[in-house]
Design a protein with these regions (language model features):
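Extracytoplasmic ligand-binding site segments that recognize negatively charged/polar headgroups
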Residues: 6, 10-14, 27-165, 176
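Short alpha-helix C-terminal cap/hinge motif
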Residues: 1-5
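Secreted/periplasmic proteins that engage bacterial cell-wall peptidoglycan
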Residues: 168
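A beta-strand-loop signature enriched in Asp, Gly, Thr, and Trp
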Residues: 172-179
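Short, well-structured alpha-helical segments in soluble
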Residues: 17-24
Length: 179
């Protein structure tokens, strides 16, 4: 196309700080980040312009993955990793995020801290689908089912299952491939 692209990459927080400090003088035309939660937070800080009305984007990106301020161009899922030696197929049948609060998982679950952006996005989706009260009860159930206090990144959760510290873990799909 002949369009010159100047790519600046780094940690999301550092890039966001830079663009906020630059304000209207920022040369950034496009910000690509790893999570819809970050897009919403960035919008809340007034750092998006809106007006995303491209027919091509509307045709290619389903409505639930875009707003007038941002569009999802990739999808990653928070999934449940499990130990096939300690978790039966019957236990996994019908497994949902909501069922992670079931007492049958007591002492068997690991997940990152609730302050992690991926978990914030998961909780936001549960609030949207199930309401605040149901999600608050779900969170209490998940906490009571934890095998240990949350620590480490997504890979640490997967490794905890492999090490026998837990039977199931919630982590993003791509982390296993990075291990």
């Amino acid at each position: 196309t002949g369009i010159k692209v100047n790519l600046i990459n780094g940690k999301a927080g550092a890039l966001e700080k830079r663009m906020i400090e630059e304000g209207a003088d920022s040369s950034a035309d496009l910000y690509i980040t790893a999570d819809a939660g970050r897009c919403g937070a960035f919008k809340a800080k007034g750092m998006t312009q809106g007006g995303l009305t491209s027919a091509a984007i509307k045709a290619a990106v389903p409505a639930n993955f875009r707003t007038s301020h941002w569009a999802g161009i990739a999808k990653r899922a928070r999934i449940v990793y499990y130990s096939p030696e300690r978790v039966s197929g019957a236990e996994l049948a019908g497994l949902t995020y909501e069922s992670l609060a079931d007492p049958k998982w007591k002492g068997r679950l690991v997940i990152r801290k609730s302050s992690n952006i991926y978990n914030k996005s998961l909780v936001a989706s549960l609030v949207k689908n199930n309401g605040k009260a149901a999600t608050a009860e779900w969170a209490k159930g998940v906490v009571s089912n934890m095998a240990r206090t949350p620590k480490g990144n997504d890979r640490a959760q997967i490794m905890a299952v492999a090490a026998g510290e837990a039977d199931i873990a919630v982590a993003n799909t791509y982390y296993l491939a990075l291990m």
